[in-house]
Amino acid sequence: MSLDINQIALHQLIKRDEQNLELVLRDSLLEPTTTVVDMVAELHRVYSAKNKAYGLFSEESELAQTLRLQRQGEEDFLAFSRAATGRLRDELAKYPFADGGIVLFCHYRYLAVEYLLVAVLNNLSSMRVNENLDINPTHYLDINHADIVARIDLTEWETNPESTRYLTFLKGRVGRKVADFFMDFLGASEGLNAKAQNRGLLQAVDDFTAEAQLDKAERQNVRQQVYSYCNEQLQSGEEIELESLSKELSGVSEVSFREFTADKGYELEESFPADRSTLRQLTKYAGSGGGLTINFDAMLLGERIFWDPATDTLTIKGTPPNLRDQLQRRTSGGN
């Protein structure tokens, strides 16, 4: 992984009681040792794989103002991180989920893009076996379950200040409250809605195949093509590119998919992040409620699975063997 750390600082928030978060600030930056680089690379990997919300700085954002001064050389990175940790503490203390943790500020470069990553990581206790096969206590940073994380694409922010996607953050374990917390701390407003872009794409694909007068099998093949392309982009960490997707669908209609979306006013960006849960609807039907969970391949609708909208009845012909076995055992009086 081609990741280079420019500067990295660690501080700590300690929850002493229900009212107070104590601030512990480092007096120096961390050295970018191999261990530190590996840790940041893992955090970058984990963060990149998660669904994120997008935003942009408001004009009044204090963090943006101080970050801009730091980028211009008027404030050093350590002082910037110490002051920002203080503001972070003040915002986090407003919420009941405030547990403290290790606060990380890292300015790094990955594939010619500069980022500022801000994270609050839990420092957990565990056990380890030493070289003498003795069991000793140890501590570790819980990177895989980090959910208070934000990242600023510094390159995008400075070269394209009108962008609505240079700032990202995770939605976290308590849903909207974590999003609100980061909005307040970052001084940000909502930006690109990736989920809405993906929903718009799905609608455009359905309308595109309908206008091309494709039969059911052909429509499903197109949906599978779109899913395969989008999933490849997702797995490689790349965005959905309308131009590239349009080339994938070049034989479907005389009108290109890109021209179709532009003419019909779908308001899709030229490129946007893939949303896994939304894209899954291209190939599957899924839903749950009232103690019932149903998930099946889209190609089965009309073949083995039939829906009557008049009575809202779903008929399944041929149940999965393991389900059938359970039904048979229960109805025959077995366990």
Swiss-Prot record:
GO MF assignments: double-stranded DNA binding; single-stranded RNA binding
InterPro entries on file: Nucleoid_associated_NdpA
Source taxon at top rank: Bacteria
One Pfam family this sequence matches: NA37
Gene Ontology CC, one term: bacterial nucleoid
Cellular compartments annotated: Cytoplasm, Nucleoid
Keyword tags: Cytoplasm
Principal location: cytoplasm
KW Cytoplasm (keyword) present: yes
HAMAP family from the UniProt entry: NdpA
NCBIfam families xrefs: PRK00378.1
Family of this protein: Belongs to the YejK family.
Name recorded for this polypeptide: Nucleoid-associated protein CKO_00588
Organism name: Citrobacter koseri (strain ATCC BAA-895 / CDC 4225-83 / SGSC4696)
